[in-house]
């Protein structure tokens, strides 16, 4: 009688605490081919980017270290750009090859600055953050273009704000306006009108229009007539006022040859031709005549 064979051991199921295997290191050479890591090349750990649209918190300075020298960097893209210099030196790219060719994908960039920005495409990092809204960018140039829409002077970190008596930007106003802009963005502000009045939150397409509007609240009249000294909030209004002194009437109606010294009265007059007096659109002929006489005298 044959002896019964013992039951095979039942393999134990892995527990949740068992560590997952570490991802392998990837060695990249100038033509982009992964190879077996020799001792004299750079080992770059694979970085998985799951969401390039999110804006993660920036890592601490010196989080990513170079394998060939003591240098440390805050961003993986900065480390890649630095290690590109080592690879270029070892492969002789600085003499016979292309020193601005990405050693990850082989893409040739116009120059070192473009190459530095190009490496962020591989890592998904967006290190250039807007201080006025949650958006972040991969390069400095698009950040500057974006901040200009907020009213930030190019090349500075200061917004175009009313100043104090010493000529310095008013930090309190900056804080108030920043809060208004953020609140408008959170509430779904009007598309195409990113600039909000800091007094009433009225949106505008251009920062210059917003500043002109804010003078209604502050009472500021920086444009003064050189003849009578009257002040105005906008230069265009001052130009129209100056025509009262010069007698210039450049706006002519093509239907009745009447002339006007400002475009506002000219547009009101034109509506009377197309809609007629008393139609509810614009002013009646009598109202227009009295308005024109009072402003053109």
From Swiss-Prot:
Organism (species): Mus musculus
Zinc fingers classed as C2H2-type: ranges: 64-86, 100-122, 128-150, 195-217, 223-245, 251-273
Subcellular location: Nucleus
Taxonomic superkingdom: Eukaryota
Any coiled-coil regions, as ranges: none
Protein family (similarity comment): Belongs to the krueppel C2H2-type zinc-finger protein family.
Polar residues compositional bias, start-end: 162-173, 287-297
Name of the protein in its database record: Zinc finger protein 784
GO BP term, pick one: hematopoietic progenitor cell differentiation
InterPro entries, alphabetized: Znf_C2H2_sf, Znf_C2H2_type
Gene coding for it: Znf784
Modification type Phosphoserine: residues: 13
GO MF entry, a single one: sequence-specific double-stranded DNA binding
Stored Pfam families: zf-C2H2
UniProt feature, compositional bias: Pro residues: 1-12
Functional summary from the UniProt entry: May be involved in transcriptional regulation.
Cellular compartments per GO CC: nucleus
Keywords noted in UniProt: DNA-binding, Metal-binding, Nucleus, Phosphoprotein, Repeat, Transcription, Transcription regulation, Zinc, Zinc-finger
